[in-house]
A protein has these predicted regions:
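Phosphate-binding glycine-rich loops of NTP-binding sites
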Residues: 13-49, 133
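Conserved NTPase motor "head" modules and their coupling/switch loops across ABC/AAA+ ATPases, GTPases
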Residues: 1-21, 35, 159-256
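Short hydrophobic/aromatic segments of transmembrane alpha-helices and their interfaces
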Residues: 32-33, 103-106, 172
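Generic alpha-helix structural propensity
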Residues: 13, 24, 28, 45, ...
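Long, charged N-terminal accessory/stalk domains
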Residues: 113, 120-169, 173
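Intracellular alpha-helical coupling/juxtamembrane segments of multi-pass membrane proteins
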Residues: 53, 144-147, 186
Length: 256
């Protein structure tokens, strides 16, 4: 894995510091933990880049304080990188079923963009936080992304007179169903998170200001029927732009 051929670290308790020369692999150790936790790098690195250039695979095993063991293996062939996961020796076939088992939080300088960055960056980060505690939310997001991609492709074909408007009916129904459930999950998460956000800020700040983080959904409608109605009313504009202009993919989060 990266520049680490083999490494065993035992009995990590309390606050732990990794020290060493630049380029010695300190961050790579943290990255390996993120792989074991969420099956991807917190650096957003390509899967192939993490495999040593003269190797075809790597293996990571982490045991938590409850003695649960999580094992992740990445193997590369000419087509793609394949991932295998196990918990306590039992193979887990779906990534969505593994994802929320070993919970970790990574914070680095680039995470300041949660405040200074775009709405898309905040939305992506908060989605990842919710997903760590809800495998259902992972499935909803994956479904919605596929539906959104298919709907946008169809919108472009309708604009070019290669498809009929009526073909949107099935996609709009699926879109509205997943959208309402995603928005419900996000609202519930923000209600829970905002309370802890304010209390945590008060403990570290000597200022009297009370900050908040707010969820600003792109659509005020909550149930799938109301969302479907709004989506249908916006069809002409969506077709003209060749893109879905409304939905949870355009939700915003703001720090106040």
């Amino acid at each position: 894995f990266r520049n680490i051929g083999a490494l065993d670290i035992d009995n990590l308790k309390g606050v732990v510091f990794f020290t060493g020369e630049n380029g010695s692999g300190k961050t790579n150790i943290l990255e390996s933990i993120s792989i074991a936790s969420q099956l991807k790098s917190f650096r957003n690195a390509d899967d192939r880049d993490m495999i040593q250039w003269d190797e075809k695979d790597f293996f990571i095993s982490v045991t938590d304080e409850n003695r649960n063991t999580y094992e992740v293996g990445f193997s590369s062939d000419e087509e793609k990188v394949r991932k295998k996961t196990k918990m306590n020796g039992n193979q887990i076939a779906k990534a969505s079923e593994y994802y929320s088992r070993l919970l970790t939080v990574f914070y680095g300088p680039e995470d300041n963009r949660l405040v200074t960055g775009t709405h898309e960056e905040r939305r992506k980060y908060i989605d990842s936080v919710i997903a760590k505690t809800s495998s259902e939310y992972i499935r909803l997001l994956n479904d919605f992304r596929k539906i959104l991609t298919s709907r946008n492709a169809l919108l472009k074909e309708i604009r070019e007179n290669r498809k009929k408007d009526s073909e949107l009916d099935i996609w709009d129904s699926l879109f509205s169903d997943r959208a309402s459930k995603i928005m419900e999950k996000r609202r519930a998460a923000m209600e829970f998170f905002s309370v802890h956000f304010r209390s945590s800020y008060e403990r570290i700040s000597e200022m009297n200001e009370i900050p908040d983080i707010r969820y600003l959904p792109n659509m005020q409608e909550c149930d799938s029927r109301a969302i479907a109605g709004k989506i249908e009313r916006g069809r002409k504009k969506d077709i003209a732009f060749g893109s879905s202009l409304q939905g949870p993919h355009r939700d915003r989060y703001c720090f106040m």
